[in-house]
Amino acid sequence: PQERTLLPSTSYFYARPEVLADAQKAKAIEAFLAAFVRAGKWSNANAQAWGEHYYRRFQKLDAESASAIQSSLSPLIFQTAGEAQPHHQRLMDTLLAAGSLPRRLDAKDSFVSTFDAVVTANR
């Protein structure tokens, strides 16, 4: 749909500071993110095969439903912390304007660049 080109869907991975400070856990997050980005890149490039496998065989949806779902989705985009901040700031500013936040928040406080290299290397 047109709205997906205007404001794409957003996904974030959250980790508590104590998890990021643990070298073993940070290494596990790094491995997970690398695999997740590669899988997303593949599903973007192979939408028909992904839809057949996931929506038709795994979810057991009919072809029409699977097609409708897939046509409503935007491609997965994998951004570094700095690349994601402007979109996140717009979302927070929208929530502030709607009265859902008590004060303005700064998006730069929501991100760490710890995993930027793994995202960049795998996208």
Task: Please identify what each model-predicted range represents.
Residues 1-8:
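Short beta-strand->loop
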Residues 8-25:
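A bilobed periplasmic-binding-protein/Venus flytrap-type ligand-binding module shared by bacterial periplasmic
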